[in-house]
A protein has these predicted regions:
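Tight coil/turn sites that cap or link beta-strands
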Residues: 23-24, 58-59, 67, 88
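Short, conserved beta-strand element in jelly-roll/cupin
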Residues: 31-47
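Short acidic-glycine-tyrosine-enriched beta hairpin
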Residues: 51-63
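An amphipathic alpha-helical interaction segment
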Residues: 115-175, 182
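Basic/polar phosphate-binding segments, predominantly the helix-turn-helix DNA-binding elements
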Residues: 165-171, 190-238, 249, 253-285
């Protein structure tokens, strides 16, 4: 089998999201500039993502980010329905649904931290749930095939319905790994919103009703990082983004704007994470 990774492309001129039915899964390792939701409609197989392999079966739903090298390496009567969507379209959807319970966990953090979770926090639909999802997929398929006026709008509308359904199912899951990533995604979302504020471990575990020890352990298991290290990296990434957007900004202003109280500590962490000092970084983007 050829293990060379290829970059797949797709034309989104019809709609911002497209249904692709797959009866013969791609076994070539590949990436792409779009993201996808895969629905296992029938059969079973082995899905490889970034070098790790996971069993998949009927009812499984998983999101794959396009920069993750992936392929199907084994399959038994496997039929997939993939909905692929442009990343800029996802940013629009993210703005709409970020507050929807289960959205960040399913679409952002489960794919991002899948390696740490060993695919234990994926979504597996019940037979009834799968039938509900298949009805929405059929609507998208019909609109794509007939292409009557306004078909692309209906496709994008039904796609949003599908996202809401998936998030509801994910949020109600009894899977313990899923419950863990739902909790931790809420803590990360809180960090994203309040990174400039004073945030303590106590602030975070109280937000999600966990004990300190359980929160620290669960966060580390899922993200591979301690909560504080994660917060520091997030703040540094926000600082770098601020500098790129406004190269005339003063380092001290950036420091305080992203939640640091000591400029020396900020400078040390910035250099450790980004690789150069804040001043040099700003000069690069003048």
């Amino acid at each position: 089998m050829n293990s060379k990774c290829i970059d797949l492309k797709h034309d989104f001129s019809f709609a911002k999201c497209v249904l692709v039915e797959i009866n013969e899964p791609v076994i070539q390792l590949h990436t792409h500039k779009f993201d996808e939701i895969a629905f296992v409609l029938k059969g079973s197989g082995i899905h490889e993502v970034d070098g790790d392999r996971y069993p998949i079966m009927r009812g499984d739903v998983f999101v794959t980010h396009g920069n993750q090298a992936h392929r199907i390496v084994e399959q038994q009567n496997l039929i997939l329905a993939n909905i692929i969507y442009e990343r800029k379209h996802f940013q629009e959807i993210k703005g709409e649904f970020k507050e929807l319970p289960g959205f960040s966990a399913l679409f952002v953090y489960e794919p991002l931290f899948r390696k740490n979770q060993q695919f234990k926090a994926f979504l597996r639909l019940s037979s009834r749930q799968l039938e509900n999802i298949k009805m929405l997929i059929s609507q998208i398929k019909e609109e794509q095939e007939k292409r009557h006026s306004g078909a692309e709008k209906i496709v994008e509308y039904v796609f949003r319905q599908l996202i809401v359904k998936l998030c509801r199912y994910y949020h109600k899951s009894d899977n313990q790994s899923t419950k863990g990533i739902l909790k931790i995604s809420s803590a990360i979302d809180y960090m994203e919103k309040h990174f400039a504020d004073k945030i303590t471990i106590e602030t975070l575990y109280n937000q999600i009703n966990m004990s300190s020890a359980t929160f620290r352990r669960t966060f580390k298991n899922i993200t591979g990082s301690s909560p504080i290290d994660f917060l520091i990296r997030l703040r540094i990434e926000k600082a770098a983004e601020m500098m790129r957007k406004k190269p005339s900004i003063r380092v001290l202003e950036v420091c305080y704007s992203v939640g640091f109280e000591n400029s020396g500590y900020f400078g040390n962490k910035f250099k450790k994470i980004i690789g150069i000092t804040p001043k040099k970084y700003i000069k690069q983007h003048l």
